[in-house]
């Protein structure tokens, strides 16, 4: 058994000299592996008398256990040293300023659309949408604007061909909705519209929202009450509001709505009116039974008035100095 003690001492010396986990594993294989020095000692038991074998086997197992404990202890030391070295190399200077978190924000026009949708949603309106590439029937003819009508010249329309165009208004959504369902109807139709115009108060693409109610016994009084409540909610002021007679081919009577500005001048904010009987007939609704009102407003214009923006083009230039003001 003196030879066994020498093997244990040799193994412990090799273990203490192992500089990393890989070298330590080589020592383990050399002494405790399938053909390791200590493992092979078990084969010598067959040379002993049967009555001596249990005691000799226990001594060999004890030697193997000593080596295994030495391996475990050295492995823990090496892993701890490696961790400390890595932590030292990855030291964080806690005195450095942290990275600033940039929070995004909704575009001011999106804020306006969301605010208006929320208000009318509480009144039972649902949001309806339609295609931006329209045909002249839904954009003009069904809205009481036939081909010879002078109002067509006011739109500066982007035409693809003689029948297809970029919609100049979201009114086509109203037509599609009235054709698809019978009254009562209560919708708002937000979306992008297009007109060939570009200056301080106009862009070729802008956002519009129209509203429509069709039901029995709908009157101009209902229209006025709805828009009064909306404008005072939107601007969060008890505004002075006036309805000024106007003309739109698809409503009769028609009006434009103005609010009194802080400078003492009237500011136009939207157009409205009672749905023209011809429009109702065009979609298969009997104007003798049903009536309705409609209104339309530009989202950029309302946003300009709410936030005091003077140039509509600012909404489309993606200038962060401008957009960050609305976070």
From Swiss-Prot:
One of its GO terms (biological process) is phenylalanyl-tRNA aminoacylation. It catalyses: tRNA(Phe) + L-phenylalanine + ATP = L-phenylalanyl-tRNA(Phe) + AMP + diphosphate + H(+). Its EC number is 6.1.1.20. Its cofactor is Mg(2+). It is found in: Cytoplasm. Keywords: Aminoacyl-tRNA synthetase, ATP-binding, Cytoplasm, Ligase, Magnesium, Metal-binding, Nucleotide-binding, Protein biosynthesis. Transmembrane segments: none annotated. Mg(2+) binds at residue 252. One of its GO terms (cellular component) is cytoplasm. Its main location: cytoplasm. Binds 2 magnesium ions per tetramer. One of its GO terms (molecular function) is tRNA binding. Belongs to the class-II aminoacyl-tRNA synthetase family. Phe-tRNA synthetase alpha subunit type 1 subfamily. Tetramer of two alpha and two beta subunits. This is Phenylalanine--tRNA ligase alpha subunit. The lineage of its organism: Bacteria, Pseudomonadati, Pseudomonadota, Gammaproteobacteria, Enterobacterales.
């Amino acid at each position: 058994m003196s030879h066994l003690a020498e093997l244990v001492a040799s193994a412990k010396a090799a273990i203490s000299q192992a500089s990393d986990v890989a070298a330590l594993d080589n020592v383990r294989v050399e002494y405790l592996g399938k053909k390791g020095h200590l493992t092979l000692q078990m084969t010598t038991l067959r040379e002993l008398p049967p009555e001596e074998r249990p005691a000799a086997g226990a001594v060999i197992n004890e030697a193997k256990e000593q080596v295994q404990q030495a391996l475990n202890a050295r492995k823990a030391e090496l892993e701890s040293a490696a961790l400390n070295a890595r932590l030292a190399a990855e030291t964080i200077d806690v005195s450095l300023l942290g990275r600033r978190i940039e929070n995004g924000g909704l575009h001011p026009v999106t804020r306006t659309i969301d605010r208006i949708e929320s208000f009318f949603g509480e009144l039972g309106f649902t949001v309806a949408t339609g295609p931006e590439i329209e045909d002249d029937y839904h954009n003009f003819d069904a809205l009481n604007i036939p081909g010879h009508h002078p109002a067509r010249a006011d739109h500066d329309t982007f035409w693809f061909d003689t029948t297809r165009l970029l919609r100049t208004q979201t009114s086509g959504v109203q037509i599609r909705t009235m054709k698809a369902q019978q009254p009562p109807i209560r919708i708002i139709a937000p979306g992008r519209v297009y007109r060939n115009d570009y200056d301080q108060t106009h862009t070729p693409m802008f956002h519009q929202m129209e509203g429509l109610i069709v039901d029995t016994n709908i009157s101009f009084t209902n229209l006025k009450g709805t828009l009064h409540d909306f404008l005072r909610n939107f601007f969060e002021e008890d505004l002075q509001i006036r309805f000024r007679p106007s003309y739109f081919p698809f409503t009769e009577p028609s009006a434009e709505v103005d609010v009194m500005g802080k400078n003492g001048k009237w500011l136009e904010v939207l157009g409205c009116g009672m749905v023209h009987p011809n429009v109702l007939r065009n979609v298969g609704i009997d104007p003798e039974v049903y009536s309705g009102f409609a209104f339309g407003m530009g989202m950029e214009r309302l946003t300009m008035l709410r936030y005091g923006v003077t140039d509509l083009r600012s909404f489309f230039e993606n200038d962060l100095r401008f957009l960050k003001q609305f976070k």
